[in-house]
Amino acid sequence: MANSQTVMAMIRLARPPFRNNHDKVAFAIHSSFVASGYILTATGRPAFADEALSSSSQNDVGIEGWNEFEGEYAFVYANPKKGSKKILVKCLAMDDKLLVDAIADGGAEPAHLEIKVGDYAEESNEGDYSAQFKNLDKLVTDLQSEIIDKLDGKPKPVASRAQSSSETNEEPRYYDDTPNPLGPQIHPSGVVVPPIPGNGGYSDLFPGPGAGMYPGRGGFGDGSMLVGPTDPRFFPFGDGSDRPGFMGPPHPGMPPPGARFDPYGPPGVPGFEPGRFTRQPPRGPGGGHPDLEHFPGGSDFI
């Protein structure tokens, strides 16, 4: 595998003449192939011939005539370690770029690379070749990955991130799976909170028949937000229908007679007798609903 040091050593050994910066980059490409184990079998005019790839010649040739065409370069290589399969490389100067195309004998598609010449060639014409190049490491790396490795059939490495089994198999958790304790719940302060019987008060979240813009009468005996006379929080061992002064259970699908119940305390507590909560006389026309509408007389009514 070529690197910038071996490529520069090949350039110094060949001592090629450069007419411009495109020449410098084109010869650096040639030196990268030689440093990767390829031998040059044709360059210049013979490399542009139609039979350049099909020629049986495997002889190593010199670099004479490699830049005889202005802005066009061609090289034919063979690699003895890879069955002497031939490779044709052509470079075309276009403005400040050098377009590189390479194809192997019998290959289906060519490898392609666009190189910005100014990123790798200096304007210096000094005898020291190292002063005429810059960023040679990147140029050699790009040639290796985009041209040479593809011609050799090496797959391009793809960065991937290994995911743990918990990332790939674990389903998202939308609900709290903390178990609900059946016994008394002890607060860190030491206060014991007894569990409340019933379903926890969910019936008023799911309206039944007659649901509309006005709320219906709350649940009765189902632990809803609106506490009724048969609420299990007051009578956990029955429906409350046998308590004195309480009406019987409602008919299926129908609320009990009268308005909806407002919350009141358990029986026997002074000031919370059920008889104190009676149905108000009908309101006259034009009166607002006390729970759902603004007070009559304007928004500043007190």
UniProtKB/Swiss-Prot annotation:
One cellular component (GO) term of this entry: nucleus
Domain of life here? Answer: Eukaryota
Residue spans with biased composition (Pro residues)?
259-269
Q: Which residues cross the membrane?
A: none
Provide the GO biological process annotations: cellular response to auxin stimulus; negative regulation of proteasomal protein catabolic process; proteasome-mediated ubiquitin-dependent protein catabolic process
Which keywords fit this entry according to its UniProt record? Acetylation, Proteasome
Q: Which residues carry this modification: N-acetylalanine?
A: 2
Which residue ranges does the record annotate as region Disordered? 151-188, 259-302
Give one Pfam family.
Answer: PI31_Prot_N
One example GO MF annotation: proteasome binding
Which family would the database say this protein is a member of?
Belongs to the proteasome inhibitor PI31 family.
Per the entry, what this protein does is:
Could play an important role in control of proteasome function. Inhibits the hydrolysis of protein and peptide substrates by the 20S proteasome.
| Name of the molecule in the record | Probable proteasome inhibitor
What organism is the protein native to?
Answer: Arabidopsis thaliana
